[in-house]
Each structure stands twice: as structure tokens, then as C-alpha cells.
Amino acid sequence: MVQQKERETFSQRLALACDKAGLPLHGRQADLAVRLKVTPKAISKWFNGESIPRKDKMESLASVLGTTAAYLHGYADDDGITVNHLSRSNDYYRVDVLDVQASAGPGTMVSNEFIEKIRAIEYTTEQARILFNGRPQESVKVITVRGDSMEGTINPGDEIFVDVSITCFDGDGIYVFVYGKTMHVKRLQMQKNRLAVISDNAAYDRWYIEEGEEEQLHILAKVLIRQSIDYKRFG
């Protein structure tokens, strides 16, 4: 009973500390998971009053929030938090990296599981303006590519920056889309009254989405930028 009360007190204090520090409610748990290098599931248990972090993680959590472990435990009343010190600065642009892979290959089965944010990449607003042409940060996400059908343009393991606000065909380009029950990253090109689905790797044949088959096509995003994971070994 005592342990349950301690967990509940910690959960309440944690939420209050996050609010005062200015940590946005949307994405709060994922943000803390990235900062503290723990799993989103562990963070969820803290907020739900199911568990309390170990001493080292409690100290790290308190440091991030600008308070003390004693406050989070409920032993002290003064939180010591500087109001809104974690609120997003207008000088930064954050891009979420999502725990999902798009297939540049034969296709990946679509999962109904909730897609977690696993980390975020920060840019200055000027860097973001140049990279993303003024798109709002909510529209830009990063996912990992698997498969080799786009090799030469996008290689297996590369990360791609995508615009998730584009959910219909928006002119020739590379898209992340679902056809039937599989997810793909391919080049789409309108040819008369049908869409050509093109793999930049010549080993893969192109295929077509004909009139009457459009209902099976669901565009999720348009690809903006590729970030390569290529390594060169010199010793």
C-alpha cells in the first residue's frame, strides 16, 4: 500500500513538473525517453504510476526537469523549477524520427501498431528553412528505408526525410505509400491515365496502378531528402 502511494505521488509530481517546465504534452513521454535514454514503455509506466525510476535515473530525470529527486518523491514541497525552461524555442526546428521502416523492395506488411517517436533531430530555423523550404516542423518526419529496389538513389538503411502533409499524388517524385496491404517507397510517375511505379534499381521491373485500382493506393508522404549511412573504412 505504501509503495502504491509512493508511485502515485511520483506520477503526480512528474506531471506537474513537466507542466511547469514547459515540456509539451504532445510527445512528452517520447521526448523524455530520448533525453534519458530509456524505452518509451518505461516512461509510460512512470506516468501511469506503475513504477518509479532507479536512483540514477531519478537524478537524471530531476536534472532534466530542473527540480530535485526529493520533490519528485514527494519529500519536498519546493520544486525549484524555472517556468517553461523546456518549452520549444522559436530558434529551433525539431524533426521526429519515427520507429517505422518503408520498403524499397517487394513491400513491407503494414502494422496497425502505434508508431513511436524514437528520437528527434534539431536544426536552427535558418538551417530548416534551407533544407525544408519553409515547411512546418509538424509536416517533416524521418523514417528508415529497407530493401534495395531504389539502390543508387536511396540505399538500404538510409534515412529519408518525408513530408507527411502530402497524402495524394503531387506530381512525379518519390513517395511513401501503401498499396493493398504493403508499404513501399518508390518513384511514382503519371503516364497517361495510369501511375507508373518505378524502382531506380534496374533489377526491378516497373509496375502500374491502373484506373479503377486507385482505391488500393494510400499515399502517406512524399520524400524530400535522403540521409546516407554509407561508411568508408581506411584501416
Curated annotation (Swiss-Prot):
Listed InterPro entries: Cro/C1-type_HTH (IPR001387), Lambda_DNA-bd_dom_sf (IPR010982), LexA-like (IPR039418), LexA/Signal_pep-like_sf (IPR036286), Peptidase_S24_S26A/B/C (IPR015927)
Residue ranges flagged as DNA-binding region? 25-44
GO MF annotations, alphabetized: DNA binding
Highest taxon of the source? Viruses
Question: What SUPFAM superfamilies does this protein map onto?
Answer: lambda repressor-like DNA-binding domains, LexA/Signal peptidase
One Pfam family here:
Peptidase_S24
- Positions of the HTH cro/C1-type domain: 14-72
Q: Which UniProt keywords apply?
A: DNA-binding, Repressor, Transcription, Transcription regulation
What are the TM regions of this chain, as residue ranges?
A: none
Protein name listed in UniProt: 26 kDa repressor protein
Q: Which lineage ranks, top first, belong to the organism behind this chain?
A: Viruses, Duplodnaviria, Heunggongvirae, Uroviricota, Caudoviricetes
> Which gene underlies this protein?
CI-HTT
